[in-house]
Amino acid sequence: MTFRLGLTGSIGMGKSTTAQMFVDEGCALWDADAAVHRLYSSGGAAVAPMRAAFPDAVVDDAVSRPVLKHIIAEDPQALKRIEAIVHPLVAEDRARFRDSATADILVFDIPLLFETGGEAAMDAVACVSIPPEEQKARVMARGTMTEAQFEQIRAKQMPNEEKCARSDFVIVTDTLDHARAQVQDIVRQIRAGNIHA
């Protein structure tokens, strides 16, 4: 019996690091952001439909995320058109992974799991969490966005407290050792049959 575990959490909470910990425990991982990256890359399934809808968004035969951000900033309605192209392709990618993976636990790393209703396809959901001030400090330390951009992203996401309240597991990512211990405990519980698919 394959167990489907959704992994979610807001920006800067340590989701990618936590996802790798599940892989270290023998779980198979599907990463929504990586799937979009594949679709946007040269030869990816999203390139042709995006070129048809937004010709300027395709640069060197790949979809340019910076150009897409600019398009969305200029025309907020463009986001719905982009999602209408990308979401079905992401769903196909996820289904291919689900149907071909051989691990007993499949982890689906999906930042907007609850926002998109994806939890319905999961047997359980784990949410990563740290206090808001630590979240902000982590994101700012990356040096990849301004404080205003961070606040804009955070405003679009469901509050992390709500994500945690709706999840079966909350993984506090204050330290690597603490996070790893929680991941190992979740995997143990699932494999022992304490959490049913």
Curated annotation (Swiss-Prot):
Entry EC number(s): 2.7.1.24
An annotated Gene Ontology molecular function: dephospho-CoA kinase activity
BP GO annotations: coenzyme A biosynthetic process
Gene Ontology cellular component list: cytoplasm
Protein origin, superkingdom: Bacteria
Compartment(s): Cytoplasm
InterPro entries the record matches: Depp_CoAkinase (IPR001977), P-loop_NTPase (IPR027417)
Alphabetical list of SUPFAM superfamilies matching this protein: P-loop containing nucleoside triphosphate hydrolases (SSF52540)
Listed Pfam families: CoaE (PF01121)
Annotated metabolic or biological route of this protein: Cofactor biosynthesis; coenzyme A biosynthesis; CoA from (R)-pantothenate: step 5/5
Binding-site positions, ATP: 12-17
Gene3D superfamilies per the UniProt record, alphabetical: P-loop containing nucleotide triphosphate hydrolases
Domain DPCK: from-to ranges: 4-197
Catalytic activity: 3'-dephospho-CoA + ATP = ADP + CoA + H(+)
Keywords of the record: ATP-binding, Coenzyme A biosynthesis, Cytoplasm, Kinase, Nucleotide-binding, Transferase
Function in brief: Catalyzes the phosphorylation of the 3'-hydroxyl group of dephosphocoenzyme A to form coenzyme A.
Family: Belongs to the CoaE family.
Name of this chain's protein: Dephospho-CoA kinase
Species the sequence originates in: Ruegeria pomeroyi (strain ATCC 700808 / DSM 15171 / DSS-3)
